């Protein structure tokens, strides 16, 4: 691969990162709009809280450590978010009868509405993404998959060991 091609790939990668940041900023507004159309009055104020609700809805019963592991968040961050979600009545905490040490979470009716709306929006995005992928051949899709797997592994390794700029293998 030529240096020019590598530079073009890198430039597009940086552009993709910037677009992703911009998209993240508009996703919450889009969620608010959809919620209003569905008559969902109360909504968490950030996407991380919405994703915690989603994680709880997908994995009930789940505890703080489970949410932290599945979402790659610190336990302290999950505690802060879950405390707020309990106060806002999106989730409840409880203990299992056979385990009084662990605190588990489940969705309230209000939280279930957020979960359902979030699932609906994700399904729409997933379908659109699959339609986009259909424009590529099987071989191209395999190359994209390999690239994304290796890039994700590299970025995850950077986060866990703090080593920036590791080359992709």
Swiss-Prot record:
Residues of the signal peptide: none
Keyword DNA-binding appears in the UniProt entry: yes
InterPro entries: HTH_MarR-typ (IPR000835), Metal_resp_HTH_trans_reg (IPR052067), Tscrpt_reg_MarR-type_CS (IPR023187), WH-like_DNA-bd_sf (IPR036388), WH_DNA-bd_sf (IPR036390)
GO biological process, one term: positive regulation of DNA-templated transcription
Induction of the gene: Up-regulated in response to iron starvation. Negatively autoregulated. Also repressed by CcpA in stationary growth phase.
Domain HTH marR-type: 10-153
UniProtKB keywords: Activator, DNA-binding, Repressor, Transcription, Transcription regulation
Transmembrane segments: none
GO MF annotation list: DNA binding; DNA-binding transcription factor activity
Function field: Represses the expression of the yvmC-cypX operon, which is involved in pulcherriminic acid biosynthesis. Also negatively regulates yvmA, yvnB and its own expression. Positively regulates yisI expression. Acts by binding specifically to a 14-bp palindromic motif, the YvmB box, which is present in the promoter region of the target genes.
Name of the protein this chain belongs to: HTH-type transcriptional regulator PchR
Domain of life of the native organism: Bacteria
DNA-binding region: 64-87
Effect of deleting the gene: Deletion of the gene induces changes of proteins involved in cellular processes depending on iron availability. In iron-rich medium, mutants overproduce a red pigment after entry into the stationary growth phase.
Assembly and oligomerization: Homodimer.
